[in-house]
Amino acid sequence: MALNKLKNIPSLTNSSHSSINGIASNAANSKPSGADTDDIDENDESGQSILLNIISQLKPGCDLSRITLPTFILEKKSMLERITNQLQFPDVLLEAHSNKDGLQRFVKVVAWYLAGWHIGPRAVKKPLNPILGEHFTAYWDLPNKQQAFYIAEQTSHHPPESAYFYMIPESNIRVDGVVVPKSKFLGNSSAAMMEGLTVLQFLDIKDANGKPEKYTLSQPNVYARGILFGKMRIELGDHMVIMGPKYQVDIEFKTKGFISGTYDAIEGTIKDYDGKEYYQISGKWNDIMYIKDLREKSSKKTVLFDTHQHFPLAPKVRPLEEQGEYESRRLWKKVTDALAVRDHEVATEEKFQIENRQRELAKKRAEDGVEFHSKLFRRAEPGEDLDYYIYKHIPEGTDKHEEQIRSILETAPILPGQTFTEKFSIPAYKKHGIQKN
């Protein structure tokens, strides 16, 4: 479903839409030798000394969202783009959708949602915090000749909240979600307490009430260990809950204890809502995950998902020259270019310029009594699961794929060659209201 879908899409040319310089060590500023800098652990003794100087002034449990951290721990992508890590195994999602058995469909949904957590930098890096109004779009050309589309926007800055939409129209699959990371300092660790939620719908499969089959999926918390002393590493911890029409699972992401235990282990049991147990989930979220049928005493565990045998399908993004100034890759380009060559002095200065401009805009809005309104996502209405949803009405019906694709592409430029329409800058709530009237 490629670019010929653009023929009748209305479009106009896009008209536009205290610093820490010098903190990085000479080692951190040295040029890379072919390696991806996201995979280089730059938090050596010098880096830990810098972090210690910053964090020694904090109390355990305090909010880190307003603390400026050194750029050597930053990944070269925004959180809005990093969310797509969870969407890079569409083959597993398509398998789930095509399964006719409700229990096996749930099992495949669990496998799909677990599949993406291992994708990320090899070193401990955090994504760039999106600025208010920042947006990111992407698409996938799938092996089955269909396309998937993704739209995300930063709808709140304090607290940070990212809203996103993903759809494979021709397979009747839709995903909506919000990511709400609340950062805390925990001594030798920092934590991102993930309070967001994902909602997956199979639009052509109806539940007992005649509505699209729906799954709600929470997120494990993310811990950066060893930020002051010892070796830094990422751990996922606590619980991830997946709830479907008939089945549910609470998967515990186990964190290693001081004396015993192992890293990266998961454990959970798939049950129905009467408490009957069906399957046990085990293994490691960044290695091999297993499933065992609890209904058969002689059952042995089998592979649910092997991260070494499945390869992620990365999203495609429009060329930089076609992007608006608030699109993630264009917005952060000078920062990510500097990070790519480990020039942390330039990265810090460029990041400061972007964030300082946002502070000035926020101050001006406060002085003028003007409220910020997102352009792509509208606030939820009573009874909805999430805080925000894409403003655009996506036509319902399994025979309306052409109209669905058109609606998605009218929301924001996604495919190469698309340009911004005059309506783009109108607040989402107004565009949503016009649709309803």
Curated annotation (Swiss-Prot):
Keyword Hydrolase attributed: no
Locations listed in the record: Cytoplasm; Cell membrane; Endoplasmic reticulum membrane
One annotated GO molecular function: lipid binding
Pfam families: Oxysterol_BP
Residues that bind a 1,2-diacyl-sn-glycero-3-phospho-L-serine: 64-69, 129, 183
Domain of life: Eukaryota
Chain positions of cross-link Glycyl lysine isopeptide (Lys-Gly) (interchain with G-Cter in ubiquitin): 276
Compositional bias ranges of the Polar residues kind: 23-32
Enzymatic reactions: a 1,2-diacyl-sn-glycero-3-phospho-L-serine(in) = a 1,2-diacyl-sn-glycero-3-phospho-L-serine(out)
GO process terms (BP): endocytosis; exocytosis; late endosome to vacuole transport; maintenance of cell polarity; phospholipid transport; piecemeal microautophagy of the nucleus; sterol metabolic process; sterol transport
InterPro entries: OSBP_sf, Oxysterol-bd, Oxysterol-bd_CS
Keyword terms of this UniProt record: Cell membrane, Cytoplasm, Endoplasmic reticulum, Isopeptide bond, Lipid transport, Lipid-binding, Membrane, Transport, Ubl conjugation
Region annotated OSBP-related domain (ORD), chain positions: 54-393
GO cellular component: cortical endoplasmic reticulum; cytoplasm; cytosol; endoplasmic reticulum membrane; membrane; plasma membrane
Disordered: region residues: 23-42
Amino-acid positions noted as binding a 1,2-diacyl-sn-glycero-3-phospho-(1D-myo-inositol 4-phosphate) in the UniProt annotation, renumbered to this chain: 64-69, 126-129, 157-158, 351, 355, 359
Subunit structure: Interacts with the AAA ATPase VPS4; regulates OSH7 membrane association. VPS4 is required for membrane dissociation of OSH7.
Function: ipid transport protein (LTP) involved in non-vesicular transfer of lipids between membranes. Functions in phosphoinositide-coupled directional transport of various lipids by carrying the lipid molecule in a hydrophobic pocket and transferring it between membranes through the cytosol. Involved in maintenance of intracellular sterol distribution and homeostasis. Involved in lipid countertransport between the endoplasmic reticulum and the plasma membrane.
Note: Present with 2350 molecules/cell in log phase SD medium.
This protein's domain notes: The OSBP-related domain (ORD) mediates binding of sterols and phospholipids. It displays an incomplete beta-barrel containing a central hydrophobic tunnel that can accommodate a single lipid molecule with a flexible lid covering the tunnel entrance. The ORD can bind two membranes simultaneously. It has at least two membrane-binding surfaces; one near the mouth of the lipid-binding pocket and a distal site that can bind a second membrane.
Family according to the record: Belongs to the OSBP family.
Protein name in the entry: Oxysterol-binding protein homolog 7
Gene: OSH7
